């Protein structure tokens, strides 16, 4: 049976993650407060951010930048700004 969480990003109940996907206290916070739907949104933004900014995940500064963007996106309600990207009009 899947567990439900009140998602901090989407501000609604949703299916929780199956296991902790990120290490440490931040990982526990994500596991306890972020839904699968919001995590999937973050993964999409994360991929775009890594590609557009040409981030190297071996570089500690780049990892820290990505972690900061992740916290801002998931918990602060801020969207990821990617220079030069124009979202498709709906």
Swiss-Prot record:
Q: Which GO terms describe its molecular function?
A: iron ion binding
Q: What's a single GO CC term here?
A: cytosol
Spell out the disulfide connections.
none
Provide this UniProt record's keywords sorted from A to Z.
Iron
The keyword Disulfide bond is assigned to this record: no
The reply on keyword Iron is yes
InterPro entries, per the entry: Fe_traffick_prot_YggX, Fe_traffick_prot_YggX_sf
Top-level taxon in the UniProt lineage: Bacteria
What GO terms describe the biological role, i.e. biological process, of this protein? cellular response to oxidative stress
Cite the Gene3D superfamilies for this sequence: Fe(II) trafficking protein YggX (1.10.3880.10)
Give one Pfam family, short name only.
Answer: Iron_traffic
Q: What is the purpose of this protein?
A: Could be a mediator in iron transactions between iron acquisition and iron-requiring processes, such as synthesis and/or repair of Fe-S clusters in biosynthetic enzymes.
Write out the similarity annotation: Belongs to the Fe(2+)-trafficking protein family.
Record protein name field: Probable Fe(2+)-trafficking protein
Q: Which organism is it from?
A: Vibrio parahaemolyticus serotype O3:K6 (strain RIMD 2210633)
């Amino acid at each position: 049976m899947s567990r439900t969480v009140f998602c901090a990003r989407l501000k609604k109940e949703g299916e929780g993650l199956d296991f902790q996907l990120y290490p440490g206290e931040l990982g526990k916070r994500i596991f306890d407060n972020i839904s699968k739907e919001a995590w999937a949104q973050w993964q999409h933004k994360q991929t775009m951010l890594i590609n557009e900014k040409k981030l190297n995940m071996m570089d500690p500064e780049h990892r820290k930048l990505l972690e900061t963007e992740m916290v801002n996106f998931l918990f602060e309600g801020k969207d990821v700004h990617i220079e030069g990207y124009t979202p498709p009009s709906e």
